[in-house]
């Protein structure tokens, strides 16, 4: 809902928005047919572990422990492997408190993570688990990524961060990043915006859908 000026008022032109609000409405959720499950077949080569279920497959590099491939048939989705990521875009407030300098060690921590172990095991005939354990260069911290691939083609990714000590610099964020091939560019973001929406600017941010540039 919007409230705006019907007529010009001093310096404010007609149509100037004065207030806005959003309310939640019930939404229709279409029926989605249940996906049939298939057996998960593992191809454990010297440098690559490939798991296949039906026409879907995922691949893991044994040297890095990273997810490097996700295919539907012959179509590859991934351009750059999934990796830990502890950095985010710097805001004006961040620049003011020097965050881009004091927290800089986290910027490349994901790329510099060293693989300690990569464990794999079948969970019955229709599921497989891969767990990659990394040591981070910041404070000797640990980062564990657990992948669960099911016979329905679902890939669940769970991450665990274990701080190495109590004196680590503040963590800008904790997550992973991945780069898809360029044909997968039609993405949309549902969230608050369009400007930054930290707690000091959250009221003016409404939920909206924004397409990728």
Where on the chain are the PLM-derived regions?
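Short beta-strand elements
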Residues: 9-32
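Short, aromatic- and glycine-rich surface loops/edge beta-strands on solvent-exposed regions
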Residues: 1-5
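Beta-strand/loop-rich accessory regions of lumenal/periplasmic or secreted enzymes
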Residues: 28-210
